[in-house]
Swiss-Prot record:
Gene name, Swiss-Prot/TrEMBL: Bend3
Cross-link (Glycyl lysine isopeptide (Lys-Gly) (interchain with G-Cter in SUMO1)): K20
Transcription regulation keyword on record: yes
Organism: Mus musculus
Position(s), cross-link Glycyl lysine isopeptide (Lys-Gly) (interchain with G-Cter in SUMO): K20, K509
Residue numbers covered by motif Nuclear localization signal: 54-56
Annotated S-S bridges: none
Chain positions of cross-link Glycyl lysine isopeptide (Lys-Gly) (interchain with G-Cter in SUMO2): 20, 39, 54, 56, 71, 126-127, 135, 140, 156, 174, 424, 509, 525, 697
Entry PTM: Sumoylated at Lys-20 by SUMO1 and at Lys-509 by SUMO1, SUMO2 and SUMO3. Sumoylation probably occurs sequentially, with that of Lys-20 preceding that of Lys-509. It does not alter association with heterochromatin, but is required for the repression of transcription.
Protein name: BEN domain-containing protein 3
Length: 825
């Protein structure tokens, strides 16, 4: 096809469309002033048309034909008609013409002139040449296949008669811009890209609308807040009928409670037992976990708070509610499900009771081998219950553990008894397989960590766990190798390494008072190894001593050893004997410790070394520096901190209890490592009255607490009824003082554990407890426990209990857990 054929096609188009020509002539008459600019536009279009016709000519010799000027002039009206039509239809209100043709202008190039029937109309994504104003229309009006411009209708009407000049005009425009013939795949990509941009524009518009609505809502909320008075901020909350308690029911629960936090926990169990059950609850979900499904909602808390406010009006203060009730509720609820998660993760699929592991019947023994074999075969099914520590064990561990590391070691003895039955086996293990050793069972180790994190929240951080607990467990396992003896030695349950002691030393077992206890359960009482000092040779120290007066004779060592409760207590008594100048009424020892740290003075290193010399003579493990540091240095520092005078020693001698002799029965199955248990620093045990609820010298019905003779803020004063309730729950006068501490210092017993920063006297770089409230505690102690030597009782029983209560973490209340156990059943 040459330029002459194109001009003839244009003539035919103009002849077949007289109405268009008339409209264009009318339009031209109204736009004479713009004729010059449009003529310039027309010339550029004809130039592009001429170049296109040259490229389309496949059989020509490459010489372009000249376009006659007459046919050029005959094309002017149609070209100008298209330009004017662009201006007329540029309004966004018109949707039947330009917007559609703007988004889908023209059609694709023809594959060949001989195949006109295969042409297909496809949208063009090039910008038209007839105005910048169409950029706005392109954004506002998406392309639509239903809306066809007159230009497209014209092309469809002439598709059977061959290519139209306007199609060639569009083709020439695309070629002028440097775009070649596009394939179907490219056009599909272009269409998807355009559709994506339209979707993005739509999303942007929706987001803008949402932001506008949010702004309107914020303004509305601000307006409403200005109209509501502060007294009306808390709306009236009417509980559903099934959650309403009668006055008698609420009174009964309140009488069993110790504080507002205790009452809140009891109400949680009473009102919402479904929160503690597994009904319709998918356990073992690896995606969400247990805590994601179980949580206290605001309506739960609001209902509980309403009931608590009836008996504790101060809870209406939000600060009191958040400080005294909310932390206890969250702590109790989270610990419940944390332990439930540990139980449900046990192997074998057996889920044991959450609150209390099944106790072994003391009267149940194996009568024959058949039963024993049956039990061994069924042992795999009961392994889950062996990995659950009951509440009583946890209470004992917490009472005696002075740090998270010690608590973890106690659990290690409980959950890994096989390592302590065979001592040489224990030294082959470490927490995570460090140092080429075998790794402990990850499941049981995770149980230890979970329990530790519950009672010591600071251990939830990985670094704290590794430094304080994992390292302490590794030290315990490493220490087993020191006491394991020779390779061929049979496993023992004795307290010390008998192979390293003289031949005349025998081992006294613990009295059998715990029939039927689980392996790993430890006793509170451990007796020292009896030693025949007549046959014992005491070597002279291999280091210089400042004077011979510090050396002890065999009789002195015998006397100190026989009056000691444990090897740690023996070291403490040596400290008292070798540093007499510190143990006077001035209590100068409070200014000293073994290392001189914490701003204190260092004890005489020579005499400390002499103490170690005597200790390792009777306890060879003390030769290891790590064992000495972990087991004895802390006890010596504790002995320096503790209040003690000659009066204390005489007071303890008066209350000393007879220790059973060698007639104690052997407990051959006692499979634990007793020497690692925490020794009693506080001197000989107190008489049975300390462990009974009858310590109160006055009948409770006749108990009347006089008013204090010193000024006390009214919130801290307790009624006679409250004092009687605390007395009923106390086990001793020291425990009574500790419970009063919790009652009168509520701000210290929260999840923040601020009490760890305090003690009675403010020693050891700690803060001192409020003297007024401490004086009030003593006032109540004197009213309940009137004795002649109240000063001794206060200093030797109450103050240590108060300081110990500040050191140890919160524990679960057993009575609450028992009730929760009933609810779960």
């Amino acid at each position: 096809m040459n330029s002459t054929e194109i001009s003839e096609d244009v003539e035919e188009v103009l002849k077949n469309n007289p109405v268009k020509a008339e409209g264009s002539d009318a339009t031209l008459d109204c736009s004479r002033n713009s004729r010059a600019s449009e003529k310039h536009l027309l010339e550029s279009v004809l130039t592009a048309l001429h170049d296109s016709s040259k490229r389309k000519q496949l059989d020509s010799d490459g010489q372009p034909d000249s376009v006659p000027s007459v046919k050029r002039r005959r094309l002017i009206p149609e070209a100008l008609l298209a330009g004017m039509r662009t201006r007329e239809n540029s309004s966004p209100c018109q949707g039947n013409g330009e917007p559609a043709s703007r988004g889908r202008s023209g059609s694709c190039a023809w594959p060949a002139e001989e195949e006109p029937s295969t042409e297909a109309t496809v949208p063009s994504y090039k910008k038209p040449l007839y105005g910048i104003s169409h950029k706005i229309m392109e954004k506002k009006n998406p392309p639509s296949g239903d809306l066809l411009s007159p230009y497209e209708l014209f092309e469809k009407a002439n598709s059977s008669s061959g290519p139209s000049p306007l199609r060639l005009l569009s083709e020439s425009q695309k070629r002028e811009c440097g775009v070649g013939v596009a394939t179907d795949g490219d056009l599909n990509i272009y269409f998807l890209i355009q559709k994506m941009f339209y979707m993005l524009n739509g999303l942007t518009t929706n987001m803008s609308q949402l932001h506008s609505k949010m702004d309107l809502l914020s303004l509305e909320v601000s307006r409403v807040k200005k109209q509501v008075s502060p007294s009306e901020l808390v709306a009236k909350f009417q509980p559903p009928p099934e959650y309403q308690l009668t006055a008698s029911e609420l009174k009964q629960i309140a009488e069993q409670s110790l504080s507002c936090g205790d009452l809140a926990c009891r109400l949680l169990l009473q009102l919402f037992p479904e929160l503690f059950s597994d009904v319709d609850f998918s356990r073992g979900c690896s995606a969400c976990g247990f805590a994601a499904k179980r949580k206290l909602e605001s309506l739960h808390l609001q209902l509980i708070r309403n009931y608590v406010e009836v008996y504790y009006p101060n809870v209406k203060d939000t600060a009191v509610w958040q400080a005294e009730c909310l932390p206890q509720l969250n702590d109790f609820f989270s610990r419940f499900w944390a332990q439930r998660e540990m139980e449900d993760s046990q192997p074998g699929g057996q889920v044991t009771n959450f609150f209390e592991a099944d106790q072994v019947d003391a009267g149940h023994f194996l009568d024959n081998k058949d039963q024993e074999e049956a039990l061994s075969l069924d042992r795999s099914s009961t392994i889950a219950s062996d990995h659950v520590v009951d509440t009583q064990d946890l209470t004992e561990f917490l009472d005696e553990a002075s740090s998270p590391g010690e608590f973890a070691v106690f659990l290690l003895h409980r959950l890994f008894p096989e390592l302590f039955d065979h001592r040489k086996l224990g030294e082959q293990y470490s927490c995570y397989g460090d140092g080429g050793k075998q790794e402990l069972d990850p499941q049981r180790l995770q149980i230890i960590r979970n329990y530790t994190e519950i009672y010591f929240p600071d251990m939830q951080e990985e670094e704290a766990w590794l430094q304080q607990c994992a390292q302490r467990i590794n030290d315990e396992l490493e220490g087993l190798g020191l006491e394991g003896g020779s390779e061929g030695e049979a496993p023992r349950d004795d307290c010390y390494d008998s192979s390293s002691l003289p031949d005349d030393i025998s081992v006294v077992k613990v009295e059998d008072n715990f029939e039927g206890e689980r392996p790993g359960r430890r006793s509170k009482k451990i007796w020292l190894v009896p030693i025949d000092f007549d046959k014992l040779e005491i070597p002279q120290p291999d280091f210089e001593m400042p004077g011979s007066d510090c050396l002890l004779s065999k009789e002195q060592l015998r006397s100190i050893y026989e009056s000691s409760l444990s090897i740690g207590n023996f070291a403490s008594r040596l400290l008292v004997h070798l540093f007499p100048e510190l143990f006077t009424h001035e209590n100068l020892r409070k200014q000293y410790n073994c290392s001189g740290s914490l701003g204190k003075k260092q004890l005489d290193p020579a005499r400390i070394r002499l103490i170690r010399h005597y200790v390792q003579l009777l306890y060879p493990r003390a030769k290891n520096d790590r064992v000495w540091t972990l087991e004895f240095v802390g006890k010596l520092d504790e002995r320096c901190r503790r209040r003690d005078t000659e009066q204390r020693r005489s007071y303890q001698q008066q209350r000393k209890v007879h220790v059973p002799g060698p007639e104690c029965r052997d407990l051959a199955s006692y499979a634990i490592n007793p020497e690692r248990f925490r020794e009693e620093f506080e001197g000989p045990p107190l008489p049975p009255e300390r462990s009974s609820k009858d310590f109160c010298k006055i009948p409770l019905d006749e108990l009347v607490v006089p008013s204090p003779d010193f000024p006390v803020p009214s919130p801290y004063l307790l009624s006679d009824k409250e004092v009687r309730e605390i007395v009923q729950q106390s086990l001793s006068v020291g425990n009574f003082a500790a419970r009063l501490l919790v009652r009168l210092f509520p701000e210290l017993f929260t999840t923040e554990n601020l009490r760890l920063q305090y003690n009675h006297s403010g020693a050891c770089n700690k803060k001192q407890l409020d003297p007024t409230r401490l004086r009030l505690i003593r006032h109540y102690v004197e009213a309940v426990y009137p004795v002649e030597k109240m000063e001794e009782v206060w200093h030797y029983e109450c103050i240590p209990s108060i300081d110990e209560r500040c050191r140890r973490p919160n524990r679960k209340k057993c009575d609450i857990l028992k009730k929760a156990k009933k609810v779960e059943k």
